[in-house]
Design a protein with these regions (language model features):
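Bacterial N-terminal signal peptides that target proteins for export
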Residues: 1-11
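C-terminal motif of bacterial Sec signal peptides marking the signal peptidase cleavage site
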Residues: 18-21
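Bacterial signal peptide processing site
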Residues: 23-26
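A cross-kingdom marker for long, charged
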Residues: 28-33, 38, 42, 200-291
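Extended, structured, electrostatic nucleic-acid-contact surfaces
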Residues: 28-48, 109, 113-121, 153-174, ...
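Post-signal-peptide N-terminal segment of Sec-exported extracytoplasmic proteins
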Residues: 37-72
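Short, structured motif recognition centered on aromatic/hydrophobic residues
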Residues: 41, 45, 58-59, 116-127, ...
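Extended amphipathic alpha-helical interaction segments
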Residues: 118-238
Length: 291
């Protein structure tokens, strides 16, 4: 949907999904993805709601401002974080290192959320009741697709797919995993089997809260404040089950990373460090270009 996707993708599209997917694309594709991030976000919005001409022009202008801000202010910070992460990986990771990485990137996400709220609150105030209904319908369809792909397969098939995906993410940084390393990755999925269902329920709660805010607050400061809180602290609408599931997932992934770190070959560790420095350099080059 327009609201959720724009909120989430300042850190994702504008930062090129750092540490999640940027290593899966070459530097040329990285440049194209970033240079056209605002256009891509605007195109994505049409999946969720049909904007009138004035709204579409306003959205484009606001995305242009977000893009320019992110390029000059945020990309250098992401580059610094990647270089610091490379240094920590090179000397072997500790739990404190992983906690630092999580905290650092969460802080950048919160900053991005605040910027999104500032730009989008005025536009959200212009959405008609029918446009809000379009967004609600898109939410329902997206959730149905999520349930079909993430919940409907049998437990064994779902666990296998989650393992395949997670191993692929790791191998994008390390290169081919050894059988023992793959087995360590495989243990994460069954230990966090409840997460997809909890995630779907959290999506629904978050979406309902977002639409409720858009309908309830009809002045820019009030809507902006509510939107900022929701984007900066999405767990504010979470229930205990989701909070426990997220904590368990974070613990499992943290321990997986620590266990893998102890088994990395010299070549694998060098590959991770090289990838981190490479993407840091590309982000600095992008930041140096005129907006």
């Amino acid at each position: 949907m327009l609201l959720r996707q724009l909120a989430r993708t300042v850190a994702a599209a504008f930062a090129i999904a750092l540490l999640a997917s940027c290593s899966a694309i070459d530097s040329g594709t990285l440049d194209i993805a970033y240079e056209h991030a605002d256009w891509l976000l605007q195109k994505m919005s049409t999946h969720y709601v049909e904007l009138d001409k004035g709204q579409a022009e306003a959205l484009r202008a606001r995305l242009d401002r977000l893009h320019a801000w992110h390029r000059t202010q945020e990309l250098p910070m992401y580059a610094d974080l990647l270089d610091q992460a490379a240094e920590r990986v090179a000397r072997r990771l500790s739990k404190d290192d992983i906690d630092w990485m999580i905290h650092s990137f969460e802080e950048r996400r919160r900053v991005g959320a605040a910027a999104v709220s500032k730009e989008l609150a005025p536009l959200l105030l212009t959405l008609s009741a029918s446009q809000q209904a379009q967004i609600a319908g898109a939410m329902t369809r997206d959730n149905a697709r999520f349930a079909k792909t993430q919940l409907e397969p049998d437990a064994a098939a779902l666990s296998k797919e989650r393992t395949k995906w997670l191993a692929g993410q790791v191998e994008r940084w390390t290169g081919k995993l050894t059988p023992g390393q793959f087995e360590r990755v495989r243990r994460v999925a069954p230990a966090t089997a409840d997460f997809p269902a909890e995630r779907l329920e959290q999506r629904r709660r978050w979406q309902a809260a977002l639409l409720r805010n858009v309908r309830q607050y009809r002045d820019e400061p009030a809507l902006g404040a509510a939107l900022t809180e929701l984007l900066e602290s999405p767990r504010s609408v979470a229930d205990d089950g989701y909070i426990r599931a997220v904590a368990r997932l974070e613990d499992e992934l943290t321990q997986m990373i620590l266990d893998l770190d102890r088994t990395l070959t010299t070549e694998q560790r060098a590959a991770v460090v090289t990838h981190l420095h490479t993407y840091s350099r590309r982000l600095r080059e992008l930041a140096a270009r005129s907006a």
